[in-house]
From Swiss-Prot:
It comes from the Bacteria. InterPro entries: APT_dom (IPR005138), APT_N_sf (IPR037015), CTDL_fold (IPR016187), Enterotoxin (IPR008992), ToxinB_BORPE (IPR003899), ToxinB_su2/3_C_BORPE (IPR020063). It is found in: Secreted; Host cell membrane. It holds the Pfam family APT. This is Pertussis toxin subunit 3. Disulfide bonds join 51-115, 148-162, 220-227. SUPFAM superfamilies: Bacterial enterotoxins, C-type lectin-like. GO terms for molecular function: toxin activity. PTX oligomer B binds to receptors on the eukaryotic cell surface and facilitates the translocation of the toxic subunit across the cell membrane. It comes from Bordetella pertussis (strain Tohama I / ATCC BAA-589 / NCTC 13251). Belongs to the pertussis toxin S2/S3 subunits family.
């Protein structure tokens, strides 16, 4: 029996090693989420996940990825307080600042919800940045009237872009950009998308891509090698 066990281990150990290496490789290449800066945090959400216009509920992953915000929350949350997150809860100062997972919306039963504003002034100058041969997915009409889309290439998210009718220097272009977004989203056409990085948006929860102000969309010529 001992000999058989040794033979079994001899065959299994290489497989286990390869499996562990595969797990580490998968973890290494998995894209991390974009963490909102602490400056976007606001505690002004009410019960049932009611975040003010222009804000949304903070997610568990975003909070876990922001050590500065965790330190700040441990300082400002009084006593045995509990707060709602988009997909969890935060147990305040007396609990030790514990972050707990829950299904989306389950934490909205508490009196206050942690919210973040969804627009960030990056300080970058106005400049044209473009991404070629991308298609629009995940169309989102946000609570603050922005229309956003995620642009992908070969199945990978490349960039997010939003158009707004009310804010930013490109608001006068909203109607034209909105029509173009709907058209390319429905048709699946490959395009070149143009963005400005003066403003960064956080409308998508746990995004693995940056999202900026949409400034233009150019259709690709299928007969041309350059888009």
């Amino acid at each position: 029996m001992l000999i058989n066990n040794k033979k079994l281990l001899h065959h299994i150990l290489p497989i286990l090693v390869l499996a562990l290496l595969g797990m580490r490789t998968a973890q290494a290449v998995a894209p991390g989420i974009v963490i909102p800066p602490k400056a976007l945090f606001t505690q002004q959400g009410g019960a049932y996940g009611r975040c003010p216009n222009g804000t949304r509920a903070l997610t568990v992953a975003e909070l876990r990825g922001n050590a500065e915000l965790q330190t700040y929350l441990r300082q400002i949350t009084p006593g045995w307080s509990i707060y709602g997150l988009y997909d969890g809860t935060y147990l305040g100062q007396a609990y030790g600042g514990i972050i707990k997972d829950a299904p989306p919306g389950a934490g909205f039963i508490y009196r206050e919800t942690f919210c973040i504003t969804t627009i960030y002034k990056t300080g970058q100058p106005a400049a044209d940045h473009y991404y070629s041969k991308v298609t629009a997915t995940r169309l989102l009409a946000s609570t603050n009237s922005r229309l956003c889309a995620v642009f992908v290439r070969d199945g990978q998210s490349v960039i997010g872009a939003c158009a707004s009718p009310y804010e930013g220097r490109y608001r006068d272009m909203y109607d034209a950009l909105r029509r173009l977004l709907y058209m390319i989203y429905m048709s699946g056409l490959a395009v070149r998308v143009h963005v400005s990085k003066e403003e960064q948006y956080y409308d998508y929860e746990d995004a693995t891509f940056q999202t900026y102000a949409l400034t233009g969309i150019s259709l690709c010529n299928p007969a041309a090698s350059i888009c």
